[in-house]
Every structure is written in structure tokens, then in C-alpha cells.
Design a protein with these regions (language model features):
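Single conserved hydrophobic/aromatic residue that forms the stacking wall/gate
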Residues: 340-353
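Conserved C-terminal alpha-helix-loop-beta "cap" of PLP-dependent enzymes
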Residues: 75-76, 268-339
Length: 353
């Protein structure tokens, strides 16, 4: 079985595993206060182009989102998000469980715009009964989005300016950030993201680590007592050096960016080969998530050899599905022009669809 259903089906990059074994019997301080976390923080600060940012290591994406958002908001405040945002659809109501509402906006491509954010916020405060409604205080975006689209530099800058003008915090979920940064259409750098958000995180779980995310905080208001929130929300690891070692290894020798570029390249190859076969796509994604629309009969055949995620039924006989490449994907697994793959994709039942 070849798994394309997510980008965390393998363990971790070999260099990380080797470093974990090498340091296994060392004694270090706990809870992220060890030398490896310190070294990793310095490498991340350098990559972000800002020595003033705080860097914290948390165990996973949901814990990170809940910790960041709950640390920033008062109990009567909520967070603006695309309706397809991860915090709204894929975190089991974790944010609502700690008392904060997702204020959802419909989007055609998973991306919020500066105009939408301004309109939503202005409409809230224009209502005479605004104090009877949840107050928008933070904007949540993810890059890439849940459907693989990315924010361009001009879009992010415009969103951040709207947020600053209206007193909103801007938070970027970067669970797949490496894959967004290294795709061909991207024009953002880590420095750009640092300068145009209040807080964001660099995903490790989906980009070569066993587990873990690195939160980068630029806004001084959000730095105070953040570690209290990490502990309270279940994101703090006693053996914190396991996180530090992983991010130290990822940010050495350009490794994080190189392995992300590998995934982006193979996703582009997969997309190109399917396009040549006449396959249409649910969305034009430049990143490691691709969403082909295929006949259900073809999908039934593909399931015998491959796993992938269901996205949406398009009509009575076709469905959109998600294929993810990752840092560990093998070249031959995305070679849809090979004899092994064309037997399923170029069958008569496909060609007449």
C-alpha cells in the first residue's frame, strides 16, 4: 500500500533519528530549557531575520492553535477564520471547548482577503448591539490552506495592515509551512511572514519531524506568560529536548527547506502527469496537496494499491480526493506515466468519463 492520504505517514528524517539516538543518554534540563532547544531557537530566529522573536516548542498542531489563540483572547472574543480553516473543521471543536468562537467567512479558495476581514470587523462594530455579540479580535490563516492554496506576499501584507488598523492579532498556522515556502508560485520568505504577522508557527509534524511545532511570537503583547498557557493547554513536553533536537536538526544545513522542496517538486510532477491524462482538479494547488477529480470506479481500483483522502463528491459518478506528497515520498510513487500506474488511470472506464 502506497499512502498519499496525509503528509505524516512516515516517522522522521533519518538525520533526526540519528541525533536522537546519539543524544539519548545525555542528561538535560526539562520542559524546553535545555541547550538543544536553545540552539534551535537561535537557528529559527536567524531564519526569521529577527533576533527579538520568542520561539516556543509545542507537541502538536491542535495544542498549538488552542494555546496561541486562547493566550491572545479574552473570554468574549473570537477568531476570524475561513470556513474551511483547520480550527473550524478538523480540531473537534477544541477552540470552542475553551470558550472561543470561530467567526467563519466563506471563501472560494480557502484564503481570507483583507477586504473580507475589514468588512466583517467593520460590520460588527457598526451594529448598535455589538456588545451582545462575540468580538472579533484575531484573524487565523493557514499557509498553505486546507486545500493547498498559498498567500502571496502582497496579500499577507494587505491583511496585516487591515489587522493593525483594526486592532486585530494576525496568526498564521504553518503546519505545512515548508511546503508552501518551497513551491514554485511562492514569493514569501520566513522573514516576510515574521514581519507581517503577530504570531505564527513552523510545522514539524508534517515536515520531517516525529512530532512538534515551533511557535514564533513577534508581538510583545503575546509574549508575556506564554509558557503558562503552553502548560495549561497540554502542549508542554517534559522531555522538551526531543523537540529541540528535532528542530535543531531540521534547521541545520538548510534541511527543512530542502526536504520541503522535494515534496513540492513531486506534487508538481504528480499534477503534471495527471493533467496530461486529462484529469481535472478541484482546486489549483501549487503545494504538496493535490486534489484530482476522478470517476468513482477508477477510485475503487486505485484503493487497492493506494490510500488517499476523500474531499468532496462532485456529481453522481465523480469525486474529488486528496493526494499528499511529503518529505519522504519516493519519485517512483508519483510516476503516473509508468506502466504500473497507467493500468488504473488509463482504463476504458476512465477514458469515457
Amino acid at each position: 500500500m502506497i499512502r498519499f492520504n496525509s503528509d505524516y505517514t512516515e516517522g522522521c528524517h533519518t538525520a533526526i533519528l540519528e541525533k536522537l539516538v546519539e543524544t539519548n543518554m545525555e542528561q538535560t534540563a526539562g520542559y524546553g530549557e535545555d541547550e538543544y532547544c536553545g540552539q534551535a531557537r537561535e537557528l529559527i530566529r536567524k531564519a526569521c531575520g529577527d533576533e527579538r522573536v520568542d520561539v516556543h516548542f509545542l507537541v502538536g498542531g491542535t495544542q498549538t492553535n488552542v494555546t496561541v489563540i486562547s493566550a491572545a483572547l479574552k473570554h468574549y472574543q473570537g477568531v476570524i477564520t475561513a470556513k474551511t480553516g483547520h480550527i473550524n473543521i478538523h480540531e473537534t471543536g477544541a477552540l470552542e471547548a475553551c470558550g472561543h468562537k470561530c467567526l467563519c467567512i466563506e471563501t472560494p479558495d480557502g484564503k481570507l482577503t483583507a477586504r473580507q476581514i475589514a468588512a466583517y470587523t467593520d460590520a460588527h462594530f457598526a451594529d448598535e448591539s455589538f456588545e451582545h455579540m462575540v468580538q472579533p479580535k484575531m484573524v487565523y490563516i493557514s499557509n498553505p490552506t486546507e486545500i493547498g492554496t498559498i498567500y502571496k506576499k502582497a496579500e499577507l501584507e494587505a491583511i496585516y495592515q487591515v489587522c493593525k488598523k483594526r486592532g486585530l492579532y494576525l496568526f498564521m498556522d504553518g503546519a505545512r509551512l515548508g511546503y508552501g515556502l518551497m513551491c514554485k508560485e511562492n514569493d514569501l520568505t520566513l522573514s516576510d511572514i515574521t514581519a507581517n504577522t503577530d504570531v505564527f508557527y513552523i510545522g514539524g509534524t508534517k515536515v520531517g519531524a516525529l512530532f512538534g511545532e515551533a511557535v514564533v511570537i513577534r508581538n510583545e503583547e503575546l509574549k508575556k506568560d506564554f509558557r503558562y498557557n503552553i502548560k495549561q493547554r497540554g502542549g508542554m513536553l517534559a522531555k522538551g529536548r526531543l523537540l529541540g533536537i528535532q528542530f535543531l536538526t531540521l534547521f541545520e544545513e538548510n534541511r527543512y527547506f530542502d526536504i520541503s522542496a522535494h515534496a513540492a517538486r513531486l506534487a508538481e510532477k504528480l499534477k503534471d502527469e495527471l493533467t496530461k491524462m486529462g484529469v481535472k482538479f478541484y482546486i489549483d494547488s501549487p503545494t504538496n496537496q493535490q486534489f484530482p477529480i476522478l470517476p468513482d470506479a477508477v477510485l475503487a481500483e486505485l484503493k487497492k494499491k493506494y490510500s488517499f483522502a476523500y474531499q468532496e463528491r462532485m456529481d453522481e459518478t465523480h469525486s474529488a480526493v486528496r493526494f499528499c506528497t511529503c518529505w519522504a515520498t519516493k519519485e517512483e510513487n508519483v510516476d503516473m506515466g509508468s506502466e504500473e500506474h497507467t493500468s488504473e488511470l488509463q482504463s476504458p472506464m476512465y477514458l469515457v468519463c
